Amino acid sequence: VHRDGPDNLLSEFDIGYGDVDAAFDAAPHVFQESLWQHRGGGHSMECRGGIAEYDTASDQLTYWCSTQTPHAALRTLVDMLGRDESDTRVVTPDIGGGFGPKLVFYPEDVTLCIAAMFLGRPVKWIEDRREHFVATTQERDQYWEIEVACDEDGKLLGIRGEIVHDHGAYTGRGINLAANSAETLTMGYVVPTCRMNVKVALTNKIPTTPVRGAGHPQATFAMERLRLGPTLHPNITYKRSNRLPNNLGFQ
């Protein structure tokens, strides 16, 4: 995707606990499931937009925008423009929904401010719905290969597998989506051992960022699918932990 990179692998890491290989070696039953969790998005009633105004006399820059994170947007803006926070304001009025994609600081945000400073007059931009579908960040697009080990009674002994996360062409919020999916896989169940290998891949698609759960729903779907999948042991049982919120793997 990017010529200056050796490949399209943005990041690779393992998340887990316990002796997973020993659990699988000793398990009388091992079952496997392949999952693809396709892309989706947070399609708010109001698309992204902003108005930038620059006062040449006072060197005051004001940016009204539909961000969910005005303080983070301010820090990013002053860093990119080389300005002081005392001379820059980011104002967020009521916005028509956010759901995660409006956490991201987009190129349009800084472009509007640069245009206002260059022209010396207010500049306004509103994203239309077609632009939203091809320019605003999306979520999911994960490929899971996952195995579960259980004993003769269907009791879970361990889970292991691989997640390949389609990150899109650029990174908007780091690798938190893929990490969250792996970290929250075991959820409220007793799973003695777990290890997930996570690969974050760059592709020529729209970047993926948090949308309604930020990776957690993917983990929930995978865990419950393991329980209900047709390839699994008909007597497999999940034991809910009575130790929440502590001492339960990642929880």
Segments from the language model and where they lie:
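Structural alpha/beta core scaffold segments of enzyme domains
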Residues: V1-Q251
